[in-house]
Amino acid sequence: MKIAIVCYASVGGSGIVATELAKCLVDRGHEVHLISTDPPFRLGEFRTGLVFHRVETPAYPLFREPQYLLSLSNAIVQLSRELTFDLVHAHYAIPHATAAYLARQILSSTSGAHVPKIITTLHGTDITLLGSDRSYSETVAFSIDQSDGVTAVSESLKRDTYRALDVQRDIRVIPNFVDTNRYRRLPPAELRRQICPSGRYEKLIVHTSNFRPVKRAEAVVEIFKRIRATVRARLVLVGDGPDLAKVSRLVQDLKLGQDVVALGEQDQVVPLLSVADLFLLPSQQESFGLAALEAMACGVPVIASRVGGLPEVIDDGVDGYLKDPEDLQGMAEQALTVLGDAKLHERLAAAARRKVEEKFSADRVVPQYEAFYREVLM
């Protein structure tokens, strides 16, 4: 198949999943064209059959802000005419599903023109935050319904979509995934010694996110403070975003400056996860929880909020633990139990890895997308 994938280039679940899907599809013999404003964060090394197309959005004084929806639609039209895509896969409804619909209408206006099918994948905040906003809701619902096929990354998000929007289109749940050949525990001993010197620290706790309010990174620090009172632990924060400055101030206010290190955005998170003892994800909302899945693949027990799609990823007490988002004390106590019981830690880590291999590996999930593509193209 010849597939166009439209996604955001920034660090975030939708862009990461879209890019990893593109790479996997190419490895399985498809021709894939990534369309975005910049090379996506996880694009990586050159692959034959994977082509990146930059969307240029010129700024004109007449407009208050650049008209990305229009330039993206225009790019899809031009590339479709040149390359005759079988389908356009829009990741994140705003504005990608709308741009794909507009492009299809333009292509359909020419007699005899090749018109690709449109698939939209819903990732989370495109529905729960932006899509349900009255400023966007009617357009988002219309664009979803006009897609030839729609997927969501969890049953939770599927329910949220029907609850928030007047959507009639059937939604197929296809979960997020990781490449288990790449995401596995390969602990570099030197990195562990650098980040968590054995003479000073016993345990290493990690949190990765885009540091937006919904991720509640300040809660991570509050939980860590309770853990640090009992265990010589260090916290590593990976990522960047609008809340990072507030988190840094909280770290200083709590006098944890020596025990918390912020590494910013990192291309490679596997080495960091491979030396971690625990992963914290006390989000207010997670439609799936890709960060938790990546940690589990690397054999890191996860303590997370019982919200959204996380219960579909983590079986409480089997391969991780779930707590109410506001129960920071409960998360801290559970963390201390896991960190203090080597056999429990080993059991959780093994079960987490096994869960990813059995349900969320690329080998399990990418064929579901291929089957859905074929179904839509019939």
What are these model-predicted stretches?
Residues 248-264:
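Nucleotide-activated donor-binding/catalytic signature segment of Leloir-type glycosyltransferases, i.e.
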Residues 265, 284:
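Aromatic "clamp/platform" in nucleotide-sugar-dependent glycosyltransferases that forms part
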Residues 301-304, 314:
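Short hydrophobic beta-strand element within catalytic cores of glycosyltransferases
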Residues 316-317, 321-328, 337-343:
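Conserved acidic donor-binding segment of nucleotide-sugar-dependent glycosyltransferases
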